[in-house]
Every structure is written in C-alpha cells, then in structure tokens.
C-alpha cells in the first residue's frame, strides 16, 4: 500500500479519482463476479472462501493457526477436551499395575523325596491310595501335624523352629487370624513301617465349629477320618459333633491323641496319671461312638492299631507297633508285633521271669505302657529340657542319636524337636494306622456310593463306581470350589469315582437340582487343566483315574455348591450325588447393600462368588429388595464380609446389624375346622393343624424316617415309635416344605364321606400348596416347624377343568394358613449350645454373663487332669452377639467359649396379642418378646405390621367364625 496516499488514520489524501468511469466499471465487474460466485456456490459451497481469502473479514478468534485434532489423528479417533481437571489429587494420573493376591503359593515346584512321576504312577493303583480327612476340635494340632508330613516329604522346606509353618493355611486371612477357615487338600507319598509307599490324599479341615461345613465337604470325598484330640483338653464340643458326623457319613474312624508333650511339660503329670488320662480319652471316644453307631465292631484301641499318639510340635508320632519296632531295631531278636499287643491295658512286665502278666508282680510295678513307652519318653524330654550340658550327650549316644556341637547349642524347643525327630524317625505309625483301618478307594467305593449316589447301585454305572473302574464311564463328584489367587475364577475340587477325567475333555456338569425328568440344571463344559493339589502348589497332570482327588479348571460356571461331572453322551441314566448334608444350621443373618447404589451389579457378582466359596452359606433377596446372607456364626460371617468387599466385588458395602431366623409353630390343635373354597367355588378343602410329637421333627430332618419309604414301612415306624394309629400312619402324604421338612400332611378323610379317587387326582396340587405354605408362614414369612396338618374333608369338582393346579394350590396354601392361625401360633427362636473353658475362679463370672443374656448353665465340671473347668450352657442366638467379647472382658481373657446351633425353642409370649405396646429403645419384658420379634421382622421384610386374616379366611369361613363366637386378636 502507498503510504503517501493515506494519512496516519487511514484516510485517503491522494489526487482525485475518475469516479464515474471507475464506478461503472467497478459495478460491472462486481456484478459479474457475484453471478460467477452464485454459480460456484451452487456447485460447491465453500469455494468462495478458498478463491478469495483476501476479500473477507476474519475475526481474531476465528483465525486458524493449528490443524484440528481430527485432522491430526483421523476421524476414527474420538478426542475429548476437558477444561477442568476432575481427577482428585489422591488418585495418580498413571495408576500402578494392581495385582490381586489373596493366597500364599509356591512359585516353583519344591523338591520332594520322591519323583513326581512316581506319584503319578501310584494314582493308577487304587489299592495303594488312601483318602483321609484330618478333623478335630479347634487348635488340637491338625495343621501342625500336616506340617510334619510336609517336612518329611519336602526336605528343602525349612522353617524357623520357633514358628509354626502352617503350610495348609494358604489364605492370608488364615495366617493373620491364626485359625483355619478353608479345608485344604494335600497329596503326598508316605512310607509305612515296612518301607512300602502309599499315596495319601489328606484333607486338613478347620477346627472351629462355625466352619464345620468345610469338614462336611472333606468327609464326602474321603474313605475315613483321623480324629485329632488334644491330650490335655480331651474330648471337646467339636470332637463329639465330628464323631457323630463321621458315623452318620459311614466312614472309618481312627484317632490321633496329639500334644502328649503337654501332659509332661505343661501339666507335669506323673507317668501313671498320664496313662489314666490317655485311657480316659479313648474310653470317652468309644462311649460316643457306641451312642451314635449301630456297628458293634467299631471300637477304638491302641491294641487294634487304630489309635496313635503324637506331638506335632516336637515331631513325635507313634503307635504301639511303631514304638515296639524301635525296641526291635535297638535290641534285635524281638517280635515287635507280638510285643506291641502287650503294651496297653492292665498288663505288667516281670523282670525276673521276663514275662508279661495281668497281675502286678509287686506293688510298685508299672503297667507295660508306662514302663516301655511313657517312662522313656519322659526321660528324653526331661534330659533335653533339664540337663543339656552334662548328661545329654551321653544319653543321646546310648540312643544312637548323634548331634553336632552347633545343634547342641540350639534353644530348648528346636533342640527337643530335633532329638525327637531323630529318635522317632518318620511318621510310619500314622501311615500303618491309615493303611490298616481306612479302606482304599476300591474297597470303600461301594458303601460310599450306596450312601451318596441318588441313582441305582445295581446299574452298569453303579457297578463301575462300586468297582472304582478307571476304564468305566466318567463319574466325578465335586464338593468344593477354590478361587484362584486373584479371586476372579474358581476351580472345582472333587473325587473321580469311575472312569478317567482328561484335560480338554468335553463333560456334562449336573447341578444339585438335576433329575432325569428335569434336565434344566445341566450344562456341557470343556475341562481345562487338571491338577493334584498340595496346599501351596499344584502338580499339573493330563488325566486323573478313578479313586483320586482332582482340581478341575473350566467347569466352575454352572456349579454353585456341589456337582456331578459325567460324559456328555452315552451316559443318559447318570443321576446326581446328593447335596451335602451339614451338621449345623445357618441361623444368623445380615443384610448388605453397596454404599454406591450404582455398584449393585458388582455386589451381586460378589455374592455369587462368595456363595460358591462357602459351602453352607445362603444368600437370598427379601420381598423388600434387601439382600440377606445367612451363616453359622459371627466368625463365619466376619470371614464372609472380609472376602465379599475385598476379594470378590472390590466395592464398599454397608452391613446391617446381625439378626436371626425364626420359625413358626403351634402349641394346640385348631379350635375349629378351617375350610377354604377355590376361586371358582367348585372345590372346598377342610383342614386342622396340631403340634407334632416331640422328637419327630428332628427324626425327619436327620433322615431317620424318609417319605420315600413304602407305606407299610412308614406306617410301622410311626406306629411303634410315636404311637400313631396305623390308618393315620399309612395316610401320610408328604413332609414339608421339602422331603426332610419338619411338618407332616396327613389325609384324615374317610372313604364313606370323600371320593378318594377324586381327592387322589388333586393330591399333587394339595401337597404343593402345603409345601408352599410351610415354607413361608403367616406370622412373618418364616419356615413353619413341628406342625401336623390333617385334611378332614374335601369337595372336589368332577370335571378336570375345574380342579386344575391354579385353583387347588393357592386354596390349599390358604387353608394351611387358616388352620395354623386357629391353633394358637407361636414363634420359635434358635438356641446355641455354648461350651466355655475357664479356670475355677472364673466360673462365677461365666454364670453372670450368661444370666444377663437369657442363658442358663446345664453342666459345670472340671476337666480331668487339668486345672480348667468346662461350663456347658444354652443361650438364645439373638442374644449371643458379642457374648464372647463380653465373657473375656469379665474373666480378664481367661475364659474361652465356642457356640453352635443346638435346637429351636418357643419364644415366650403371644405374637398376636395386640394389647402389647412395643416401646422404642426399651428392652422388652419376657412376655412381650414374641410380639416384638414378629413386628420387627415384618417391618424389616417390608410386610404390613400385623397379620391380616382377610387374606387367609374366605367370607364363608369368617361367617362360621362369627357363628361360633370365636374371638380373634387379628386385624381384619
């Protein structure tokens, strides 16, 4: 631009322009240009800008200095621009890689004293396999005993001698709490006294009564149990329950009396008293077995070889036979098997005649067990503990034990362990006991199948399983689900009963609800990898033959608790193994919900996983939408609520205060006959309700009596044991709410009054209505218990169209409710059996704490040969929360208690008494408790506050009530 033609403000100051011509020419040019531009715009909008960039005014903010993100990265890349940093300072911009690890596992296969190929070869010989569950009371030394077996077979697994290895406590939570939570399988090769090797599949189980469901899962796939008993504590609460459970599962029982060092080093009992203590334990166990078992040959005795003695802490384990073998190896020329038969009971050794007699030669003579076993044991322990420097080396030389100077300088505990380990050697006595008294999978298969398989034992499949045939059709029973290290997936653990399972094989997984008629609960899966589990490491194998335990990958998706795995084709008659029957009941319940409601799907996924992980855990959704978890006790639910948010769902979860489940029952017979008509007015059912005889509900639940029996056998049982008349006994239609439910439906109609053929045609519908009604009672939607419902009359339509299930089922349920409400209904609450161990001076404090919680003591006795007392008591489960903490506070931590569900008991008071006013935040007196429990349970479930009888009574029935002048406490 020529600066002389313009001033500093941009005004033109040059010579005059030829305006007329210029304007005309400029106008023509502009017009031509505009026409051209219009044409171009029609063809291609936007060309104008490109052709004449200098002709338009562009604002500063519209100028384009850089290419757009779309031009740089391409149209397929989404770019998001945020003008503000929404990420909190606590969250890193680049998050570290998060690894979830909840179990303690070996990184590589450890060195073993046997080759892995040898272990795999033994799997093919079922006669050399033993499937054993180690069970016992809490802290009676099961895990420590397995540690000894692991050390024996894994020479490089060294540990600090002052600290337990706890090799089977693979969860970090188990290590932190110091208590076993999960059953852990271990497979090792162990030699017997003669040096013959056997493959041992050992299940180490938790000792706490809350986790007895884990024991049940282990027992199902075992052929025998080794019951561990602390020599100082003796038979405890869980010991007795486990004996009963093992006998019910028809398993071989052997006993290991553990921690015998406590008798010597802690209680300081003389050898004779120690013998009496050990004999008392054996006698007590035999007494319990005879109480629960009908098999008179099931006797435990060290003479028979089914009792061994051990001290896991000091690596001691012997039977009479293995100790006699030590004498034979030391002195020679001794028939150790004959010698062992004379080492228990009232048998004495006469040193003059060198013979054994049943009569003491002198007044100071000791029994042979004391003289030949306890006294040498006492001397070894006393020498090591008492006089290490002077006489110990000489004593050890006499025993043929040689220690280095460095080993002699060890602390007392590791030194004593080392000396005992060298003296007693390997745990061959334990192996002898299991080999002789626990059947191999081949021998134990038939009783196992008869007890657990729902199909016929005489079929081809049943015979293949009874023979433990590795070439037969595949049948595998899984009882446990183990999560992976990160808690994302599960592996199924079970026992192959027939055939051989291969990696990569297609299989059919049958769930617990599968039947030949309804195959919905089944799925075809492909087996992933297969492992043999050894606690902290797994040995991968290509196949597992019948008789062995196996950990299976890839079949976890359809399995909830237990499953039956079979071949997908050609095995159509395969039926399932019956679900686990636990020896305890889940009565404690808590409600859970996510802190952030949008994370509900994550919580539901976590609930599904935790349901797989804990065998007896139950999860359900109430009508109010509340998610409820039911468990056996406080510790059990505490472990569940550790795993659910941290391991399986990774979200924050709110937990409600714990409550208990209730049951509903009646205490009298219905005051009048209750009837209900179907909606089409064509059918009418009349019933009454009355209480069952005492003990009958428990017999049904424990399967002492089964509805599947024929009518004659069923009739005889009720006639002889419960004094029923034969007609009523043979007229039992069903138990409810299922085949082992504690209620009975009886057809008490007369052929002269009722058309039995028509009634029989609607039997299934009436039974279904009865079972529906007993599953959800009218008081607070809880299970009905201990009630007998009698059908007194029935009017049934002639046409099948008018007596369909849609008419009969709801009517049967309604008449069940009305008969129940007319029979003085009551609530029942669960009661715990509590066992407390405490010193004598703390016993009074235990009484005080129990009395404050509606509890009462039933027995209070000293433990023989111990300074402790055992207090046995009952306490309502609803008042048991925090009981253990309260007890320890009052006894300065000296008392230790365990509690387990025992029975149901009627809550004092009438739940339907409207005259009772429930005042908030006030403890209610005893007569008001039933009303309080009912109202609060109904509120929590989202039900109306009181029972409305208009739901359950038809108009004709209400008129009948008015005629009979029956006073009702229920709101209309």
Curated annotation (Swiss-Prot):
Cross-link (Glycyl lysine isopeptide (Lys-Gly) (interchain with G-Cter in SUMO2)): 64
A family per Pfam: EFG_III
CDD domains: eEF2_C_snRNP (cd04098), EF2_II_snRNP (cd04090), EF2_IV_snRNP (cd01683), snRNP_III (cd16264), Snu114p (cd04167)
Primary subcellular site in the record, as a coarse category: nucleus
Any one of the GO CC terms: nucleus
UniProt region (Disordered), positions on chain: 1-54
Keyword set, alphabetical order: Acetylation, GTP-binding, Isopeptide bond, mRNA processing, mRNA splicing, Nucleotide-binding, Nucleus, Phosphoprotein, Spliceosome, Ubl conjugation
InterPro entries given in the database record: EFG_II, EFG_III/V, EFG_V-like, EFTu-like_2, EFTUD2_N, P-loop_NTPase, Ribosomal_Su5_D2-typ_SF, Ribsml_uS5_D2-typ_fold_subgr
PROSITE patterns assigned: G_TR_2
Cellular compartments annotated: Nucleus
Feature: compositional bias, Acidic residues: 17-26, 34-48
Bilayer-spanning residue ranges: none
MF (Gene Ontology): GTP binding; GTPase activity; U5 snRNA binding
Binding site for GTP: 136-143, 204-208, 258-261
Similarity section: Belongs to the TRAFAC class translation factor GTPase superfamily. Classic translation factor GTPase family. EF-G/EF-2 subfamily.
PANTHER family, A to Z: 116 KDA U5 SMALL NUCLEAR RIBONUCLEOPROTEIN COMPONENT, TRANSLATION ELONGATION FACTOR-RELATED
Quaternary data: Component of the U5 snRNP and the U4/U6-U5 tri-snRNP complex, a building block of the spliceosome. The U4/U6-U5 tri-snRNP complex is composed of the U4, U6 and U5 snRNAs and at least PRPF3, PRPF4, PRPF6, PRPF8, PRPF31, SNRNP200, TXNL4A, SNRNP40, DDX23, CD2BP2, PPIH, SNU13, EFTUD2, SART1 and USP39. Component of the pre-catalytic, catalytic and post-catalytic spliceosome complexes. Component of the minor spliceosome, which splices U12-type introns. Within this complex, interacts with CRIPT. Interacts with ERBB4 and PRPF8. Interacts with PIH1D1.
Name of this protein: 116 kDa U5 small nuclear ribonucleoprotein component
Protein's organism: Pongo abelii
